[in-house]
Amino acid sequence: MRKLKLKINDKDYTLEMTRDSIKWLEAVGFSIEEFDKKPVTFYDLVWTSLFITNHKDVNPSLAIKLMDTYKKSGKNPAKVVRFAIEEYQAFMNALADTDSKENDEELEIIEA
């Protein structure tokens, strides 16, 4: 998975969407299919999830403050959220990839 590097308030942040951040998103109720119904809530959750792997000291409240600071500095948080959603979808596609040529492993299925 790709990583994104941001500088906010003169501090470097390495943001990424990982299995742990996706599990966190699921635990707090995120659903990509429901994004249209709760766009602001899910937008904030997706932004926040990017900090989970490398910045455990960043709680959801601080993550939102960092997003506001990022926006006030003239940058576009929507691009970061778009990156996160692309990474989320790539992870889900890889998880469900049953047609891959690399995945031609034969499984031995036995009756229980």
Model-derived segments and their meaning:
Residues M1-D12, I22-K23, A27-K37, K56-A112:
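Charged interaction scaffolds used for protein-protein
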Residues E16-M17:
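Short linear motifs in exposed loops
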Residues F42-T53, R82, E86:
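Short, hydrophobic/amphipathic alpha-helical patches that form generic packing surfaces
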